[in-house]
């Protein structure tokens, strides 16, 4: 500024200024010829053309090598899917444009596949907040800022990114689309697409069929030479549009290196400026292309061995009966014998299956208590006077009705030493439990003289017991 003022005072001519409307401000015929020589003939032809046209070196050595390697036949590139978005009208014949740098497109912005929030209200004054990496005092890191804003979105997430290899951010986008049902648009650079597809495959995310996620490819501007050679640029725009209300834009790429190693900055914008980013995203969406077809699934290989095909995976179901072999040619008797159905082998009977199941079944509960037989009762009667502990056992045995007693009552022999009579009615019923004092176990001395005599000695003569009843059985008659 001071130098120009000093030159104006001294009257020194600083040279003619190129106006912005002049073609020479953005276009150079010498640079175009040099670039055509680079794409068609190589780096040596490019240097020769630069010297012949007396141009300043406008390409570095790395740019020269990159452009020469990226050059391709534009007739092959033209066969790729059209970059027009869904809803836009196209024609087979490219009519071109009447102006070299058209200011506006004749076609309206296309309708996006997952919808787009429309809010015509004024969003307020534009406000900006700067975040850096490494973070400043009291500020979150750039990756944390982006993740928090994505997790807080509830209407829309639209991402334009050059390199996308961060798994955490991809999982956040998938979670927003599938769980919170937030439309997610993702526009990626064409040259960096293989890295993103590899990341999605490792995470088990299908970018072609993930619900509520639209992934498309964007390429930079193209230069086409007269020798059918073409070179395309990359996408350097990086911003995230959230709910149509907030925008995160800056130098941060969705990579681990940008989150941990590289220095960068982003700006969180709100207000009226968001409408400009919304228009830019829809413009890029209109120029984008769908993803290339998904590669066929390869059989998985574990430890150098190819895993066989699972028999439980059914690729196609057909309701077709199995074809029977054709009948052999010959006499009618042979053909009838071939068509005769052979008798089926008889299977096991139901009773055999039930017995096998019962044998194989293991008891899950406590073992069943064995029943008392008549032999057990006679054995207990022999041990009646042994000890006090045995008396308790005798009482427990005498106070319970066992299957042996029930069998003896049914046969008329009685379940006790006195020959109990079956007191059930003729039509049947439950067996009553006998009183405990009526069940007596005889000691060896009592068995020697007889049970009845011993019982009579214990009671006064001529006195009839109050609970005496006619008994039938061994040694007792009514």
Curated annotation (Swiss-Prot):
Q: Where is this region: Disordered?
A: 292-334, 359-436, 452-478
Q: Where is this region: DUF1669?
A: 1-293
Q: Which keywords does UniProt give here?
A: Cytoplasm
Record's keyword annotation contains Repeat: no
Q: Which GO terms describe its biological process?
A: signal transduction
Q: Which gene encodes it?
A: FAM83E
Which organism's genome codes for this protein? Answer: Homo sapiens
Effect of changing residue 277 to A: reported as: Decreased interaction with CSNK1A1 and CSNK1E
Q: What is this protein called?
A: Protein FAM83E
How far does the signal peptide extend, from start to end residue? none
